[in-house]
Amino acid sequence: MTRGFAATSTREIAERVGIRQASLYYHFAGKDEILAELLQRSVRPTVDKVAKIEALVPPQTRATALYLLALIDIRTLTEAPHNVGILYGQSDVTSSEVYAEFHHARQELVDAYGRFGLQSASPSVAADTDARELGEMLMHSIEVVTDIRNAGAAVTPQRADRIAAAALRMCDVPNEAVATAVSTAANLLEEFHYEDVSNGEV
């Protein structure tokens, strides 16, 4: 979809994913339904795990929750087919009728980032921003994964660790607390069957 979603035919989409066009229409009524599914795949797997993260991580250690959320989000964006996360910024996508549903799901994720971020942040950071602004900044820092993939580079476990740790440092989390979050999250990842998403190093 390098030419944009609007300029891409359903036949081209079918060829790209290796199925017949007729099979594509068996599952989707048209391009808008395909777009809706692609967008949801880039955000919904992470959103669906937010409640579990909050249940696993005590409120006093929210830096771990933020780090865990970032790692899971990185995995979602890394595993999204054909780097569909890159679609977010395309004008023909943002103007589509199905974008609103995706935007709602994405906002749930922004809210989670903002909530965990403020609970982790230093007093100075918390005083200078609100949850919505901080959530957007944190999420944008994670979405660099789509640019890395677009450039043809691999999102290695080491790179995932660095990106997730950078989110904590945006909140002015002390290095010692970052290290604790990294090691704790590495153990908690087994609860999500993501044992290989992180190597526990920064």
Question: Language-model segments: which ranges?
Answer:
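C-terminal peripheral helix-coil segments that are non-catalytic and often amphipathic
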Residues: 111-122, 127, 144-202
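Helix-loop "lid/cap" segments that line or gate small-molecule binding pockets
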Residues: 71-78, 86-93, 166-172
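Amphipathic alpha-helical packing segments from all-alpha helical-bundle domains
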Residues: 47-51, 86-89, 94-122, 129-143, ...
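Helix-turn-helix
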Residues: 1-37
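Hydrophobic alpha-helical connector segments
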Residues: 37, 51-79, 83, 138
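Short, hydrophobic secondary-structure boundary micro-motifs
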Residues: 84-89, 176-180
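Alpha-helical elements of Rossmann-like donor-binding domains used by nucleotide-donor carbohydrate transfer enzymes
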Residues: 12, 33, 65-68, 72, ...
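Short, basic, alpha-helical segments at the C-terminal edge of helix-turn-helix-like DNA-binding modules
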Residues: 40-47
